[in-house]
């Protein structure tokens, strides 16, 4: 089929009341992005003539945020069912074209399954995506007579006998625009929901002796709909299983795929090992020969080659260069850059700071708004005091500086390269030349 005659309608106007949540259903996240976005991405990958999203007022902000000249957004005036939604726009389409109907709450459909439908559509007026399920739950049932599809009955309108049918309707179908224009205005709302069902066109097509084909999805999991939080969790599990499988097949060792979560995109090299309970969010890049230990959370960050991220570290909007060691229990916040061969250890927090090559902060420190040179030692308990109550202030530390334990650096401050700062020192002024810096303190002994 020529996709230049393919028009896609995405139905996204349902109220989502079964979610029991004060958040639009299709804006809940699946794999780190809104449910609806998955369906839009699928539609765009098919390169159709047009894409139209029929939405309700809950999605106005999402529409504005995702404004795209290739997508038309139509607000459903009254929420009276899928048939009513399509009747609002059907006359916008030319005759003798094809219309693919997707659902905003069925986000796991693969491109391969849709392409199978497109091929089958050449020999029919309507092609449905159906599946046989051992536990059909609340799906509409496919009614056949002598193997021929004659009707779709929705779950709430089905008899007990019909509910025993295992073949179900995914909702996804391809139909000719010419016939849809005719049938869409013949359907009625005489059902338990008092809604106009798009599925009623099947019985109308059968009466007019039109051929109705069906196609099975690549996997039954693809047709998982999302109407409540339980189904969302189920869909997330399916999605993460798919992502873990793809990564394993591409050479990433994931030790516990059932406890790995990719909530965005990952670009990666070779020889990567990811342990139990790791979460990757947003856009993440990982180089070659990287080890990520249990419980790490990595968001919108880049990790270079030959790095080890030790257990329970949190890394966000950070660039880590090559041969670095991070963690365990390290928090790297936005604006952090670790140059080659750096080592950041236990209970160290870094924010808006560049740590130069071969520098190390191995224990219990806070470094904020800092530029730190090469081969600098940050002793345990070092704190950059970078906030004066009104604004953040900068700390600059030159190369080869040694900072002893339990040191406070009062920003703004500039410390010359080669300086040695003794343990327990509070540094309040710039150090303009290599120096030994300490605060005089008396050690007092009193007899008990």
Curated annotation (Swiss-Prot):
Its EC number is 2.7.7.23, 2.3.1.157. Gene3D superfamilies: Hexapeptide repeat proteins, Spore Coat Polysaccharide Biosynthesis Protein SpsA, Chain A. This is Bifunctional protein GlmU. PANTHER family: BIFUNCTIONAL PROTEIN GLMU (PTHR43584:SF3), NUCLEOTIDYL TRANSFERASE (PTHR43584). Its cofactor is Mg(2+). It catalyses: alpha-D-glucosamine 1-phosphate + acetyl-CoA = N-acetyl-alpha-D-glucosamine 1-phosphate + CoA + H(+); N-acetyl-alpha-D-glucosamine 1-phosphate + UTP + H(+) = UDP-N-acetyl-alpha-D-glucosamine + diphosphate. It is an enzyme of class 2 (transferase). It comes from Buchnera aphidicola subsp. Baizongia pistaciae (strain Bp).
